[in-house]
């Protein structure tokens, strides 16, 4: 099977080792590791932020040479910060950069994330959890081939955590590839693959079942009947 994403020798200044990785359409991958291990740096390198090295291809197309409109079709990047500097409405944030022909997509994401009641409010007036839903809707609205999401489940209540996983799974089923940074081990089984990171390197890559013991060792915890617990 041809990979949707091919990343070759990606780096980000001194924070990320030289990495190669591939991902296929329909996959949901979680980057997991302790604070400072390189999850955000890897996402930023794949999103081609300033200072990123190496090459990234999506469906064989080099992302660095794609025009801005094409880049939006190929990938979306949700940074960890939920701050938005623009005093514009929720609907306008979601629709930013789209054409009038995309009205149906915008309305569908507003409905998916239950934002109709706040659609005309400035995004800065919303709670952190509401802003997270708005920015997730914005990331997903163009139905990009690759979704790169930094802690998308942070600040969400239990319902919206599970609903967001459901929406990401639907995006993957429709042909996108999804890579997220994840801290909460309670949700690792929702993902097809885990990439365990430490010191700017991927130290293991496999299914949640395959990496259960390594995951526990990485954090000093172990799986029990009631979930994860401290290793004694």
For the regions a protein language model found, what residue spans apply to each?
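Helix-to-loop junction immediately C-terminal to a conserved catalytic motif
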Residues: 47
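ABC ATPase nucleotide-binding domains
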Residues: 213-232
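H-loop (His-switch) and adjacent beta-strand-loop-beta switch element
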Residues: 194-206
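Conserved ABC ATPase "signature" region
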Residues: 104-119
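ABC ATPase NBD coupling module
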Residues: 62-76, 81, 86-87
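H-loop/switch region of ABC-family ATPase nucleotide-binding domains
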Residues: 181-183
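Catalytic Walker B motif of ABC-type/P-loop ATPase nucleotide-binding domains
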Residues: 147-151
């Amino acid at each position: 099977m041809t990979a949707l994403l091919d990343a070759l020798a990606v780096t980000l200044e001194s924070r990320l080792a030289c990495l190669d990785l591939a991902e296929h359409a329909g996959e949901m991958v979680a980057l997991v590791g302790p604070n400072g291990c390189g999850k955000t740096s890897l996402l930023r390198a794949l999103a081609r932020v300033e200072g990123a090295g190496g090459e990234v291809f999506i469906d064989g197309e080099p992302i660095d040479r794609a025009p801005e409109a094409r880049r939006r079709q190929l990938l979306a990047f949700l940074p960890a910060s939920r701050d938005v500097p623009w005093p514009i409405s929720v609907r306008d944030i979601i629709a930013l950069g789209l054409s009038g022909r995309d009205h149906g997509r915008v309305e569908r994401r507003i409905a998916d994330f239950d934002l109709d009641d706040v659609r005309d409010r400035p995004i800065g007036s919303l709670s952190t959890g509401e802003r997270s839903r708005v920015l997730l809707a914005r990331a997903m609205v163009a139905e990009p081939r690759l979704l790169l999401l930094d802690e998308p489940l942070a600040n969400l209540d239990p319902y919206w955590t599970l609903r967001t996983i459901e929406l990401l799974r639907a995006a993957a089923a429709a042909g996108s590839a999804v890579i997220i940074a994840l801290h909460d081990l309670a949700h690792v089984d929702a993902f097809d693959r885990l990439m365990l990171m430490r010191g700017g390197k991927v130290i293991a890559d496999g299914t949640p079942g395959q990496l259960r013991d390594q995951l526990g060792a990485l954090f000093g915890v172990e799986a029990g009947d009631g979930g994860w617990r401290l290793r004694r």
